């Protein structure tokens, strides 16, 4: 069992070195405080040392909802709100002493899902015994890894929910809403798209729900988005969106209509979810 794990870990380490990933930038005051720009299509490198804790800090408006790793038995993950604490731990081997964390063999991938975004990491257990300054730089661990997010586009007017820089007539506003029992608290007051992005606008002070795109087979996938004033700007246009917050659920349907022939938002009195 242990030998198989060591062989698999060795192969994983080889595969890790063969792929590109985003390396965080060390801080000017302390290299262990690292920053990386967020991009939904990039894998980020996280370097840890045995006996130390690393924390990954996501956007303050995010909440971690799921964490998965390829070698979960060798790592401890503790999510708290928008912060994920990571620490290497011994591998429990049957019939033999537990294997202590070993640099290289503990390398794995880490996937994090929040209520706003998806994140992908290469998680590396680096060695503190670097023979050269270059090797030390490559093994530089992170006490804190934080993301820098792209600025949300400025709305043309705070009084208007329309954010896209396209003529109003080019917007598709034909959206219908199906509200679950007791779910009015997460219902948007407007929905529209410009063919590339979808806007869901909410009342001031209203909490934002998690947003999922629904596939034809019913599978739900968390979407990437950013916040623009009182709107969630979803980085895609989908036939069906599902909004969720606790037990509250709302279904948003894109009716693909001509904006000039439809009201701003159709709130249908459909059967509850």
Swiss-Prot record:
One of its GO terms (cellular component) is cell outer membrane. It comes from Bordetella pertussis (strain Tohama I / ATCC BAA-589 / NCTC 13251). Component of the type IV secretion system ptl required for secretion of assembled pertussis toxin (PTX) through the outer membrane. It comes from the Bacteria. This is Type IV secretion system protein PtlF. Residues 1-20 form the signal peptide. Transmembrane segments: none annotated. NCBIfam families: VirB9 (TIGR02781). The gene is ptlF.
